[in-house]
Amino acid sequence: MDNTQRAFVYGFLSTVFSDKLSKESIADIKNNPNFLDLIGENARRFFDENDIDVLDEELNIDFTSAFLVNSHPVESSVTDAKHQISTGLENPVMNFYIENGFEINLNNTNLLTPDHIAIELGFMQNLVLSADLKLQKDFMRKRSEERRV
């Protein structure tokens, strides 16, 4: 997989984890055989065998169940001394973004923390597009270390 494909996959996953897909996005996926080949035979079959309305309903149910009702796709939930989720500069992920020129504004989004998986995948997409392999590895290493603590 080349960097363009990797960046596309990171961008797609960032979108999927941030909100339910719009009917337009579902139609784009349904009409993109190369992408369906990339994400697998079962996904291709699911998109080929269902119309846009059924796909919208099924994917909305899955998104709501997986990411809103049962849990949020937040990787580590960094908490402070009061056990509240750290959303600003006290969150080490936010500091890593800032140190590496990746600015996010959580005020205009439903994503609550900088370590939301959609934001992390968007960051990885930017790193792939910049071809900064060292920073990609540093980010993944630091995230792995934080999960072990």
Could you tell me what each predicted segment is?
Residues 1-148:
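Surface/interface-facing alpha-helical segments and adjacent flexible terminal/loop regions used
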